[in-house]
Regions:
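Acidic, metal-ligating active-site segments
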Residues: 205, 209-237
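Conserved pre-motif C helix in the palm subdomain of viral-like polymerases
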Residues: 1-13, 103, 128-152, 251-262, ...
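Active-site palm subdomain of RNA-directed nucleic acid polymerases
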Residues: 1-41, 45, 267-283
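A short, polar/acidic, helix/strand-boundary loop motif
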Residues: 1, 226-260, 297
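Catalytic palm subdomain of template-directed nucleic-acid polymerases
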Residues: 18-56, 66-74, 290-303
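RNase H catalytic domain
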Residues: 23, 69, 264-331
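Short, conserved micro-motifs composed of acidic
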Residues: 61-88, 328-332, 337-349
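C-terminal reverse transcriptase regions that engage the nucleic-acid substrate
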Residues: 87-201, 206
Length: 350
């Protein structure tokens, strides 16, 4: 109903209606502006449009105190300095751990609920226990994907050993799981800037995607590199994606896994450019000269597996965007091998 109402108002408020429809998720609206005046104009217009159909926008939240002051009225619910992603469960609303600290304007994590869940059963974990805990990690952007990947690789080992759902994990896997959960408190230190530095005056806007693969997993990680008007560059982690490789009997060769990581990188390019609507200068990096050779040549030369993936990669990206990076300088190495929280947080390359 409200979408039909907004479409009717599009001729009168084209910019605001477009922003709302583009950034509305169920009943949560996430938007922004370059300055306080523009933010207030968007917020007030949105409030008035929804008021026409008796829908009140509330729970206003902003990293700008001046914007919040304009909505600190009795009819509005008081804003807090943290926006938590929650879901409804039998026990009530539970924080999934990802939050936005508006005072410092960073995306951060609260692993306390994971730590408490791990303490409830310190030893004798079953496959069900491990999967239950790891599935509670809510990291849609993949900011801590190497940590989650390490858990998933351990799950695969449990499957390979034929461990039943309620069967105890072998001692070596139990010890590995214990080390992972013991390091979860380090996730408190993950703080990623919400604003990546883009503005109407920032140029150029670079997107760098790194990809890598190992026999256990493959993945890609994306960074934004922005040059401000003062000539300084700002580099921020945007997102990442990891995947565990198939079981050994169905596992492709390592060069083909490297090509799969390039495909994953290309898909991330499409996702980010579509979502941000920014004219990025894209550069894709891989440490596999074989995969780069496949991408840079005519796909018709290769067999079906390689040909299909090269077609997809070159349909999304240009072959000239792809460059080689030494393996030791590739941050996506963490996406292909996994890392505990204790190793990921201090890793400068991430």
């Amino acid at each position: 109903m409200f979408k039909k109402h907004l479409e009717d108002l599009r001729p009168e408020f084209p910019n605001v209606v477009g922003l709302i429809l583009d950034q509305l998720y169920v009943d949560d609206l996430l938007g922004g502006a370059d300055d306080t005046e523009a933010a207030l104009a968007i917020a007030n217009t949105a409030k008035d449009m929804f008021a026409q159909i008796k829908m009140k926008l509330h729970k206003w939240l902003s990293n700008c105190p001046d914007v919040l002051k304009c909505f600190q009225e009795p009819q509005h619910e008081p804003a807090t300095n943290i926006l938590k992603q929650v879901v409804s469960t039998d026990a009530g609303a539970k924080a999934l751990g990802v939050r936005w600290d508006t005072k410092s304007d960073v995306v951060c994590f609260d692993p306390s609920y994971l730590i408490e869940a791990a303490k409830q059963k310190p030893t004798g974990h079953t496959k069900r226990d491990m999967l239950r805990l790891s599935s509670r990690i809510f990291d849609p952007l993949g900011l801590i994907s190497p940590i989650v990947l390490e858990m998933r690789m351990l799950h695969q080992q449990l499957w390979a050993k034929g461990v039943q759902w309620d069967g105890a994990a072998p001692p070596e896997l139990e010890a590995a799981w214990q080390k992972i959960t013991d390091d979860l408190h380090h996730v408190h230190n993950v703080r990623v800037p919400r604003w990546i530095g883009t503005s109407t005056s920032s140029t150029p806007v670079e997107l760098h995607i790194f990809c890598d693969a190992s026999e256990k997993a493959y993945g890609a990680v994306v960074y934004g590199r922005i040059r401000n008007v003062d000539g300084h560059f700002t580099v921020n982690l945007l997102c990442s994606k990891t995947r565990v490789t198939p079981m050994p009997e169905k596992r492709p060769t390592l060069p083909r896994l490297e090509l799969l990581s390039c495909e994953l990188a290309a898909r991330l390019v499409k996702t980010i450019t579509t979502a941000t609507k920014i004219e990025w200068q894209v550069t894709c990096w891989s440490d596999s000269k074989v995969a780069l050779g496949w991408i840079r040549r005519n796909p018709q030369r290769w067999k079906q597996f390689v040909r299909n993936r090269v077609f997809l990669i070159t349909n999304i990206t240009c072959s000239s965007w792809w460059r080689h990076v030494p393996g030791l300088e590739n941050p996506a190495d963490l996406c292909s091998r996994g890392a505990s929280a204790g190793k990921l947080i201090p890793a400068a390359i991430w």
